[in-house]
A protein has these predicted regions:
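Short alpha-helical interface patches
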Residues: 26-34, 88, 92-98, 148-157
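A conserved beta-strand-loop-helix scaffold within acyl/acetyltransferase catalytic domains
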Residues: 1-83, 96-97
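A short, terminal or domain-edge coil/loop segment
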Residues: 54-59, 81-84, 100-103, 155-171
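Acyl-donor binding region in acyl/amide transferases
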Residues: 67-133
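Active-site/acyl-donor-binding loops of N-acyltransferases
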Residues: 108-173
Length: 173
């Protein structure tokens, strides 16, 4: 989209506020260009939805479409006007658009393993559960380590790598 700089800045603010790591802006541009190919029938299309208050962008989400499924993949919001709950409005709009496109499933993509308030993802789960629907467990994401030595090195470096990735968000806020 034309609003990359603004969207990434809001995403960076969200990552700093909520303490999660993000990738460099070029990663998200690659994801966008890879999946936003409506002329290719085998790939989903995607769209950003942006909420504004008095002309000020305050929240955005990215929704990906594939067949009869819509996927909520990335969400972001500023600290301004959070009391107006723009992220809920965006989800509602995304669900309406998905239905208009013939989607029968709107996938909120991700929940904690155990539903416990001490879990780092509890706030995300609380937000998503407030939208209705049901939790559907799937196989999920897995790591395959063809070389255990490299994997051990990788897993020991992860905290440092995540710190660097978190710094991407701090640089943009």
């Amino acid at each position: 989209p034309d609003d990359w700089e603004m969207l990434y800045k809001i995403y960076a603010e969200t990552s700093v506020r909520d303490g999660f790591a993000i990738r460099d802006e070029s990663y998200y541009k690659t994801v966008w260009s890879t999946f936003n190919q409506p002329e290719t029938l085998n790939l989903p299309t995607c769209e950003p939805l942006i909420a504004e208050v008095d002309g000020e962008p305050v929240a955005a989400i990215f929704v990906f479409y594939f067949g009869e499924r819509a996927y909520y993949v990335y969400g972001m919001s500023t600290t301004n006007h959070r009391n107006k709950m723009p992220t809920y409005l965006l989800q509602w709009e995304a669900m309406k658009r998905a239905k208009e496109r013939g989607c029968t499933v709107y996938d909120l993509w991700g929940a904690p393993e155990i539903f416990d308030e001490s879990d780092d993802m509890w706030g995300v789960f609380r937000f998503k559960s407030g939208l209705g629907g049901e939790v559907v467990r799937t196989l999920g994401a897995w790591y395959y380590a063809p070389n255990p030595l490299w994997y051990k090195l990788y897993t020991e470096l992860i905290p440092r790598v995540l710190d660097v990735m978190r710094s991407f968000g701090k640089k943009k806020t």
